[in-house]
Each structure stands twice: as C-alpha cells, then as structure tokens.
C-alpha cells in the first residue's frame, strides 16, 4: 500500500465509543486537491471509494479554512465524539487552514488536518509553492501549524506513519487535549509503498475518558459549597460536551444555585428554567452579572474563563470570592488561582456533588433575589423583541423574530460581530445543541461553513432539526464560498443575512473607545462622513441578495418598509417549510442596540490624544478598570470550611 492508502484506510477503521454510543471518529474527508495531494491522498480516497463505497466519503470544499470550520461545526454537534479530516495541497492550500486550526484548538474541539508538504527527499527543491528559508532549509509553511495544533507531526519516512497516526487519534479523542491535530504529508512520501501490518488497519475503538473526581478534591469542593452563602455557577461548553445538562438541571433544582452560561455553555439549561439567568460576562444579562458580582463562591463547570466570561476580571466582586473549577483539563481547572480544582468530567462530578450535598442550599433571601433578577431580565428581553415599525429594524427585533420562527430543537449558528453579543443576551435556548455560537476565536466567516458542518452533524444523527445561520454583511463578504457546497450536496440551511453596511460591532466599539467609528462603515472611498452625520456618504453598490442568488439558492429580500419584521416572519415560515436552502436578506439599523447587561470588556484606550472623544473615553476606561481584580487565589477560606473573610487590599 502507499502511505496515503494506509492512512485513509486506517482513518476509516477508527471508532469512538461513549457509553452506549459508537460512531466513526472520522466519518469523511473534506478536500481541495492540488499537485501536492491529488496523486497521494486523492488517489487513496478514490481507490477506497471503489473498493468499499461509502466507507470514507469525500466532500469537495471551496475554501480550505472553511473545511476546518465544517469539521468543528460537526464535532460540536457530536459533542467531540467525531470530526472530519481536511486534506489540502502544498503551500497556500495548507496555509489557508491555519485560521481553522487556531479556531479548533481555541474552542477545544477536534479537527484533523492533513496539509501536504514539500518533498522529503528535496530532489526537486524548490517545488511549486514551496517557501525557502536560507537559515533553515528544512522549514516549510506547515511549521506554522505547530503553535496552533494540539498535536503536530510530519511523516518524513513511510515507517513513521504508524506511530504518528495512532498518536494523532489519541489526542483527537482526548477531552483534555483535543483541538487541531495536524499530520503534514510530504507529497513524495504520500505515494511511497510500505508494508502495512494488519493490526494497523484493524478496527480500533477509542473509549472517551470520563475521569472521576478525586476524593480529596471532591470533599474540599463540597465543604466550600456548603459554606457558601451566595454560590453561583458558570456553565461552560464542557457541560454540553460531557452531556451533563441533565445532571446540571437536577443539581440546581436540588440546591437552588443560580446559573449563568458562557457562549459555549448556551443550552446547559433551558432559558425558562428557574435557576437560569442567561449569559454571564461582557455580553451577559444584568441578572447573571448582578448575581455573579455578589457571589462568594463561583462554581465553574467546563469553562475556559475567557475575558468575555469574566468581564475582563470585573464580574466577580465579592472580596472573598473563591472558585471551584470543574474541568477535564488541569490547565483550565487551576485558573483564577483556585485552591479548589476538580480535574474531572462534568457529568461525573455533578453526580458526585449531588450525592454529597443536601437539598436546598441557598437561603430564601437569595432564592428571592435570583427569581427577581430573572423576572426583570425576561421582561427586558420581551421589550427588546417588540417590533418598532422602523423600515430598518434593530438587530434585537430581528433576533426575536428568528427566535419566534424556530422550533425548540433548531440550531442557531453565529460567530463574529455584534450578533454574538445580542444572541448571548437575548436568544432563548430550548435545546442543549440549539445554541451554536463560536466565540472562543470569534472568527468572521465561520458562520456558513460552521453551520454546514452543524447540519451535517444533525443529519448524521438522523435529526431533521433546522440549522439557522445568522450572518452580518462583514462575515458574509469574508467567507461565503461554501454556499456552493450547500447547493452541490443539496443540504438545507436557512441563512439570514443582516446587512448594516459596515462592521457594526467594531463601529460601536470604536465609538466607545473614542475612535469615532473610523474605518468601520462600508462606503465609497473618500466620501465617508467621519463626524457620524452620514452627510454625502454613498453606500457600496453591492447586492448581497443577488450574490446569494447566483449560487442557485432560493433568496427572499425583505424590503425596508414598516412591515419589515412581519415580512421577515413570513419568509422564515416559508424557509422552514421548504426542503431547499433559503437565504433571507434584511437591512438593519446598526445604531439600535440590545439592552445593557451591565458587563464590561477591557479594550485599552490611548493615555494621550488630541481627540476630545478619545480623552473622554480614557476617563471612562480608567474608572471602569478600577473594578478589575487579579484573582490569584487566597481571597477566601471556604475551601477550608470557614467563612469568607474581609479583604483589606493589603495583600497580606
């Protein structure tokens, strides 16, 4: 067999086992062929398709970055049990996957990357698309994958394939180590012959690890939770990937502890659950943020504690706050200097905590506070969803209309711009897999490709749930090429393009930091009104609806009239009923914002400026920054079974 043939057949025989679930670890390959892989990986895929049809399906992609996004979208829908391989040619084909690799690793989601590499023999150096560095002849562009991958290796000799492939799969299915896994394949080595042991090609099962909490760590966590007066749970993506949403629901119903979710943790509890207060942090709800600010114990479950979750370390203001961090990854479990890490599976740990803790831990006063904050925020969202009758509605109205049109099991997909923040505050999640916002790397262009991957994941599970992609014009222009794949494979998506003629999110941020929305509006060069008046500005004559229609998709354009929201609702109903993909285009007013959730995000403002707007922003920034805390540990003593002590700020 050739090296490529052996690798492809090896991948076809890998299985992930998670309890009663058994599925192919690599159910298919995305690819774009070039001279670096058409005779290697390309030939191997064709040969296996002839010999064993359907065992390793090949899906033609249009952009290499988008291949990885599809893999991540699929992996998220399958709770990290499965992902696709992405095969790219040498040079620019390979480097196009770098952004996707970073996204996968940042999100702790598996993706297998197979970039072609230059000749191992160097017999034809420099080959087409090869980068040369005089100070290191052995360097190739694929070395750029090293800091972006959780595992990287290069098959320099055929005999290396066996150990590399097994180790790659080991990392891919490990919940604590997973991310981008990269195997660089020199184009000459791909086609070399090798004697392959039958054991290498035999079916192999990878049983997902569900590590139990250590007794000592669990006992310390239990003591801290018992002693806490105002505990608060931050539910992260680990709750979803562990399948622990049922255990979380039972735990909070028993104890009364309130929950705020990260972006990845959306779906950990249904929006209308009594203990669920919505998103927490910079884009969170006022309900979650007010309770988080007063919490004396934060129980982080499967969270990375990004700056958006912690409000750039302003969210947790109790002087003696402590953290019980439950995570399969020690790196995340030890964050915020906690002395109470629980390095274990979320589902197993919640089961153990439920068995060790009594019912109804929180006081009546605290429970009433939780209920009151929830009622207030729910009413705020209701108000945000009320149609304004404007020709160009605000984004919150659009979100509310999409929400009303979807079924509970449908999936909303987003990643970048102002939509993630609005969705985190406003979207009412009704299914553990229904909220799919990529906000670890927050990559413009993820939406359509990631949505396609999510839909593949749903179809593979036999689900007919609709996947609704909401995308701004900025992200659409960045990467919409996988619409061709949607059409080619007849996969149904509902795509809502929200056009605000610029980078609305960064425009708002620019105004906040005193940069006056400079460079954030889509206008003809040279006639932007930087004073914000819009006087004399000409919009770019780009017709995104026509562009989408050119792919062969059904397209509905919502005219800017007072009935725009009603028209959007009707278009969504028709799209839901249709078996085909539908793109719905609507214009929005970028200056109509979602309600304030009282979170903060640290974006530094210049200390010196001649612009009055920047000087004002700097004063505001300095005031907000005073709430930041280092969170290095030792703030309280709950873990030892004592009561929170006062912190005089002396550091003693």
Which role fits each region the language model picked out?
Residues 61, 155, 262, 415, ...:
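Conserved beta-strand termini and adjacent loop/short-helix elements that scaffold enzyme active sites
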Residues 122-135, 289, 333-334, 341-343, ...:
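Thiamine diphosphate
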Residues 147-152, 204, 376-389, 529-530:
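Short glycine/proline- and acidic residue-enriched helix-loop micro-motifs
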């Amino acid at each position: 067999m050739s090296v490529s043939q052996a690798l492809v057949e090896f991948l076809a025989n890998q299985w992930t086992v998670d309890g009663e679930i058994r599925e192919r670890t690599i159910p298919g390959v995305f690819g774009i062929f070039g001279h670096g892989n058409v005779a290697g990986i390309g030939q191997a895929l064709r040969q296996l398709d002839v010999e064993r049809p359907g065992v390793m399906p090949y899906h033609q992609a249009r952009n290499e970055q988008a291949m990885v996004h599809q893999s991540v979208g699929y992996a998220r829908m399958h709770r990290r049990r499965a992902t696709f391989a992405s095969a790219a040619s040498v040079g620019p084909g390979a480097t196009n996957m770098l952004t996707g690799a970073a996204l996968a690793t940042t999100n702790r989601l598996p993706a297998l990357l197979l970039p072609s590499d230059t000749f191992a023999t160097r017999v034809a150096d420099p080959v087409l698309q090869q980068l040369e560095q005089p100070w290191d002849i052995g360097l190739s562009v694929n070395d750029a994958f090293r800091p972006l991958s959780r595992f990287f290796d290069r098959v320099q000799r055929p005999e290396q394939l066996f150990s590399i492939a097994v180790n790659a799969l080991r990392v891919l299915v490990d919940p604590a180590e997973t991310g981008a896994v990269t195997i660089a394949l020199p184009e000459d080595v791909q086609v070399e012959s090798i004697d392959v042991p039958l054991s290498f090609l035999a079916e192999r099962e990878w049983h997902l690890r569900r590590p139990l909490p250590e007794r000592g760590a669990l006992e310390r966590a239990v003591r801290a939770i018992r002693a806490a007066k105002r505990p608060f749970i931050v539910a992260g993506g680990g709750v979803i990937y562990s399948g622990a949403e049922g255990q979380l629901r039972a735990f909070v119903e028993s104890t009364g502890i309130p929950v705020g979710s990260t972006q990845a943790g959306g779906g950990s509890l249904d929006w209308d659950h009594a203990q669920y207060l919505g998103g927490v942090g910079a884009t969170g709800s006022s309900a979650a943020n007010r309770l988080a600010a007063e919490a004396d114990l934060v129980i982080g479950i499967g969270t990375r504690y990004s700056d958006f979750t912690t409000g750039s370390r302003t969210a947790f203001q109790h002087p003696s706050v402590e953290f019980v961090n439950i995570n399969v990854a020690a790196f995340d479990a030890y964050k915020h200097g906690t002395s109470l890490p629980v390095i274990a599976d979320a589902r197993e740990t919640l089961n153990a905590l439920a068995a060790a803790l009594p019912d109804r831990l929180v006081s009546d006063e605290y429970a009433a506070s939780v209920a009151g904050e929830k009622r207030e925020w729910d009413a705020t969202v209701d108000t945000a969803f009320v149609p304004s009758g404007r020709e160009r509605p605000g984004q919150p109205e659009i979100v509310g209309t999409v929400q009303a049109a979807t079924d509970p099991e449908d999936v909303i997909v987003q990643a970048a711009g102002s939509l993630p923040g609005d969705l985190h505050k406003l979207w009412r999640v009704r299914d553990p897999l229904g909220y799919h916002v990529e906000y670890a790397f927050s990559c413009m262009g993820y939406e359509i490709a990631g949505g396609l991957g999510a839909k593949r994941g749903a179809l593979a599970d036999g689900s007919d749930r609709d996947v609704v992609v909401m995308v701004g014009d900025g992200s659409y222009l960045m990467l919409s090429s996988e619409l061709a794949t949607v059409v080619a494979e007849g996969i149904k998506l509902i795509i809502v393009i929200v056009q605000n003629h610029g980078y609305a999110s960064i425009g708002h941020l620019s105004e906040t930091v005193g940069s006056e929305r400079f460079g954030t509006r889509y206008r003809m060069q040279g006639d932007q009104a930087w004073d914000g008046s819009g006087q004399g500005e000409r919009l770019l004559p780009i017709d995104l609806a026509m562009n989408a229609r050119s792919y062969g998709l059904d397209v509905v354009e919502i005219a800017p009239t007072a009935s725009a929201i009603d028209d959007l609702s009707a278009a969504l109903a028709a799209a839901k009923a249709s078996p085909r993909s539908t793109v719905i285009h609507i214009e929005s007013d970028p200056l109509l914002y979602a309600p304030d959730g009282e979170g903060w995000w640290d974006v530094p403002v210049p200390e010196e400026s001649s612009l009055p707007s920047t000087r004002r922003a700097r004063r505001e920034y300095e005031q907000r920054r005073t709430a930041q805390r280092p969170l290095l540990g030792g703030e309280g003593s709950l873990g030892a079974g004592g009561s929170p002590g006062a912190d005089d700020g002396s550091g003693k």
